[in-house]
Structure formats: structure tokens, C-alpha cells
A protein has these predicted regions:
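Short metal-coordination and nucleic-acid-contact micro-motifs, chiefly zinc-binding Cys/His arrays
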Residues: 31-34, 66, 102-106, 150-153
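Extracytoplasmic/periplasmic C-terminal soluble domains
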Residues: 128-168
Length: 168
């Protein structure tokens, strides 16, 4: 009898571990701010998914996508969340950090000419220079404005930001 119980406990622990792994994977994959064209206005909107809800549903089935926040909700009441289809189609590509990483890939600093290099969460982030020659960090940009800013601004490395802020 104890071998049967031991076997059931092992199977049960395996199922719990598998469920926790699926939940954790969904949470990590679905967190972060995304930029997507709002289906109602076709304007860029910064959205955040509800990763905990998706993680919980991922234990037993495909993660359920729901919005936790949207930059358009400040202007209009919460919507029908029609953008979720667009997000599901480009889950990784619409994450702000992915958009920025792809944009910086292969670029050189406007000030010093050094390669910007690969973007890493653990290193200093490259910056941007406006057409008016003002240098600023990513955190100074509203996420919904990232696509427009990247069309008009130039890449700047962290060293040049530090040098510029110490000179002025």
C-alpha cells in the first residue's frame, strides 16, 4: 500500500511542479509594457496585460489574456479590449524593450560613433537624442510615444549621456 501511495505522491508532485512551471513561464512571458495600435483609433497605445491572471489560467489551459492597464483609458472609458488579438499575434514583438532592442541593433552613437551594442537589462541603457539635440533616457518617454520618437530621434550611448550631463 505504501508503494502505491508513494507513487501517487510522486505523480501529484510532478503535476504540481508542471503547473507551477507553466504558470511561471506565462507570467514571465506576459509581463511588461507593450505598444499596440488601438483598434478604435489606430493610434499607438501602451498596454499592460494582467500576468497573474494569465499565469493562473496557464496551469490548466492556454493563458487567458486580459488588460490590466491601457494609456487610452485615461481618455476613454475601459474598452472591449479588441487589441488583445493583435497582442496575441505579436506577443514578443510589441513589448517596448523588444522594440527598443531591435531599433538599437547595429546602430552607433550619434555623439562618439561607438557601437551602441546589445541591450541588456543588467547594463546601462543607451539613450536618445532629439532633433533639438537634447539627450534623454528611455524612462523619459511615454511608452505609447516610442514608435514616433524612434522615427525622429538618434541613438546615444550611456557614456555620452554621462559626459553630457556632467558638462552642462
Amino acid at each position: 500500500m505504501t508503494r502505491v501511495m508513494d507513487g501517487l505522491v510522486i505523480v501529484l508532485l510532478g503535476l504540481v511542479g508542471w503547473g507551477l512551471w507553466r504558470a511561471g513561464r506565462a507570467y514571465v512571458k506576459l509581463r511588461g509594457t507593450r505598444v499596440v495600435a488601438c483598434p478604435e483609433t489606430e493610434q499607438p497605445a501602451a498596454v499592460e496585460l494582467a500576468p497573474w491572471q494569465a499565469a493562473i489560467t496557464a496551469i490548466v489551459r492556454e493563458p487567458s489574456l486580459r488588460l490590466r492597464d491601457c494609456s487610452r483609458w485615461r481618455e476613454i472609458a475601459p474598452c472591449q479590449q479588441a487589441c488583445l488579438g493583435r497582442i496575441a499575434e505579436a506577443l514578443e514583438e510589441c513589448v517596448v524593450s523588444t522594440i527598443l532592442s531591435k531599433w538599437y541593433a547595429g546602430k552607433v552613437c550619434t555623439c562618439c560613433g561607438r557601437p551602441v551594442g546589445q541591450i541588456s537589462r543588467w547594463r546601462h541603457q543607451p539613450c536618445l537624442m532629439s532633433p533639438g539635440m537634447r539627450i534623454f533616457e528611455w524612462k523619459d518617454i511615454a511608452s505609447e510615444n516610442v514608435p514616433a520618437v524612434l522615427r525622429t530621434h538618434a541613438p546615444v550611448c550611456w557614456r555620452c549621456l554621462v559626459a553630457e550631463t556632467h558638462i552642462s
